[in-house]
């Protein structure tokens, strides 16, 4: 498995000869020119996870790619094509399995209605298992080797992030959802995750691919 962090919550996953892109949002442009994708995945409708201005171009430039999104995305974002991926469902692509977990975005404020959110568990035989939770810390699937760990959002506090990482109990982690943080904030939460959990953290914000051993 090879992982490339393309800014904020966008992650390119290369595993079992397949290329999957998760959450092409508007806090990053590094994914705009990505080609040869097999799957495009979106955890929820917020624009920092699916950029309504540029996602159509991404889909058009990857005509062979399947597009699977949390079902509410289909109602609020104009996509050239796409299918709904609801919680507790799964898709298979060659030797790669994508399991959707959770169902709801974390609470931002009691006055803001909750929307749908699916965490994504990506696995292939003989490869590490990756968990990208989107914007929720409510579900901690078992058997995760690598956690895409959200560092900060208006829906989370560090104490919750640490407890979430402990519950997932992955061997490796790397930061996502860092677009609202100053560099000092990134280092603070990154350091706490590393020191307060059993997870080995990897800073992938330079956009260079990281190969995870099986």
Descriptions of predicted regions:
Residues 1-35, 84-143, 155-160, 205-214:
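Core dinuclear metal-dependent hydrolase active-site scaffold
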Residues 4, 78-91, 162, 166, ...:
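Binuclear metal-ion centers of metallo-dependent hydrolases, dominated by the metallo-beta-lactamase
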Residues 21-22, 41, 68, 132, ...:
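Structural motif
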Residues 27-69, 145-148:
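Active-site metal-binding motif and surrounding structural segment of the metallo-beta-lactamase
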Residues 46, 72-73, 104, 137, ...:
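Catalytic metal-binding/acid-base residues of hydrolase active sites
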Residues 49-52, 157, 183-184:
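Conserved alpha/beta-hydrolase "acid-adjacent" motif
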Residues 53-61, 159-167, 189:
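A short acidic, amphipathic alpha-helical/loop segment
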Residues 63-72, 171-179:
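Short internal beta-strands
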